[in-house]
């Protein structure tokens, strides 16, 4: 019985431990109605994202992949959740998720090693 359990848990732990962009899927469900989460799509212009989400709490230049990254703070039921929208060098969305821009940069840096 123990070996069967270990057989199923070990690969799952390996996949989770080695993934470079860990995000909580519950956050996607919790914040799915937020305009940034619901409406922003890959390829969208920076101006369009600003019209949807407003000014970010912080904007930083990306160093690992050329471009810009916007940090937002989503609020729901008294809980704050970081959310990033990243842009390529042409100013188009190339990523978004429940991390800070700093965490995104760290993940990208680690993937390039």
PLM features per residue range, with description:
Residues 14-17:
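C-terminal motif of bacterial Sec signal peptides marking the signal peptidase cleavage site
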Residues 1-7:
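Bacterial N-terminal signal peptides that target proteins for export
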